[in-house]
Structures are given as structure tokens and as C-alpha cells.
């Protein structure tokens, strides 16, 4: 999901 990708980006 998009949120999952953002967590890794953060």
C-alpha cells in the first residue's frame, strides 16, 4: 500500500 511505502521512505 501507499502507507507501507511511505513508512519505508520515512
Swiss-Prot record:
GO cellular component, one term: extracellular region
A GO term for molecular function: pectinesterase activity
Presence of keyword Transit peptide: no
Single Gene Ontology BP annotation: pectin catabolic process
The enzyme's E.C. designation: 3.1.1.11
Domain of life: Eukaryota
Annotated compartments: Secreted, Cell wall
Binding-site residues, substrate: 8
Enzyme class per UniProt: hydrolase
Family of this protein: Belongs to the pectinesterase family.
Protein name per its UniProtKB record: Pectinesterase
Amino acid at each position: 500500500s501507499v502507507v507501507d511505502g511511505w513508512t519505508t521512505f520515512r
